[in-house]
A protein has these predicted regions:
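Sec-dependent N-terminal signal peptides
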Residues: 8-14
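Helix-enriched interaction subdomains in cytosolic or periplasmic regions
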Residues: 2-8
Length: 314
């Protein structure tokens, strides 16, 4: 049930297409540059590994270089410049700022490089492969609202303002707005997409709000950090939901934590699809739709044992 069946069927077709194209293509895939938000996040590590695995299926000698932008736009500009200087064939881009990154995207394309946005949109990219993040936010917050019986004090622990985070928050807000008994206390604190950031943001919330019933965090590292903060302050009875389906959240859902659900992503499949699409574009095969969405699935304490996870190849 967690195989993202419809999407994976499409990916299987794309794999077959790309493999066939590899035999006839007049432009080989020799190198890929990958720049992501943070290689301290296992999610982005999985993206890098998935992309490398697919690239080496196409060409065993392909060189794949992955770097961490740390959500720093200027740093990412420099990384893209370095990829251009290295004459990579393709860049997989997890943009620090989806709009401001456009000049770097255009510069890479002018150098003959195909740019595929991964996980978040990037202005000017040849194509984008990402989770349906609006749906991910909706799933997590629908669970949260139902768990609270449609009433209570809730916060949205925000994060870096990339398109994926904005979409998740918008999806969550849409669901919460349908529950008049739920009071949204705050949605503007940046948990920085990390465990430490989530813990710091949650400590502030717990100090500020003596009664807190539910928390939606924009990713799993923030959820784990928020749970740690609640433990440190001996706060119980809070429902935490998030997005990712990371290994740490599997552990949290099986243990004694406040985390109750996470909308899963599939970074391995996302990365493989991104390489497929980019390789096709390199050889004149543009996708029918440049925005490719992978549907999320909700993991809870009730079904986590059957969840296959995304840390292993598939």
């Amino acid at each position: 049930m967690f195989k993202h069946q419809a999407v994976l069927t499409g990916i299987a077709c794309a794999l077959a297409f790309a493999t066939a194209a590899a035999h006839a293509a007049d432009k080989p895939l020799k190198s890929i540059g990958i720049t992501v938000g943070s290689l301290g996040n296992p999610y982005f590590v999985t993206i890098a590994r998935g992309a490398e695995a697919r690239a080496k299926q196409i060409n065993p000698g392909a060189k794949v270089t992955a770097v961490s932008a740390d959500y720093d736009l200027n740093k990412q500009f420099t990384q893209i410049d370095n990829f251009i200087s290295a004459h990579v064939d393709m860049i997989l881009l997890n943009a620090a700022d989806p709009k401001a990154i456009e000049p770097a995207v255009k510069k890479a394309q002018a150098a003959g490089i195909t740019v595929i946005a991964v996980d978040v949109a990037a202005a000017g990219a040849n194509a984008t492969v990402q989770t349906n993040n609006v749906k991910a936010g909706e799933l997590a917050c629908d669970f949260l609202a139902k768990k609270l019986g449609g009433k209570g004090n809730v916060i949205i622990e925000n994060g870096p303002q990339v398109s994926a985070v904005v979409d998740r928050v918008n999806g969550c807000k849409t669901v919460l707005a349908k529950n008049p008994g739920i009071k949204l206390l705050s949605a503007d604190q940046d948990g920085k997409g990390s465990r430490e950031g989530g813990m710091n943001a949650m400590q502030g919330y717990l100090t500020r709000f003596p009664k807190l019933d539910g928390v939606f965090t924009i990713n799993d590292p923030q959820a784990v950090g928020s749970d740690l903060a609640a433990k440190q302050l001996s706060r119980t009875g809070i429902v935490i939901t998030s997005v990712d389906g990371a290994p740490d959240i599997e552990t949290a859902l099986k243990g004694n934590t406040l985390v109750q659900a996470s909308s899963s992503q599939d970074p391995w499949a996302m990365a493989q699809q991104a390489v497929n699409v980019g390789y096709g574009i390199m050889n004149g095969q543009k996708p029918a739709n440049p925005m490719i969405l992978i549907e999320p699935a909700l993991i809870t304490r009730d079904n986590v044992k059957s969840y296959k996870g995304w840390s292993a190849p598939h």
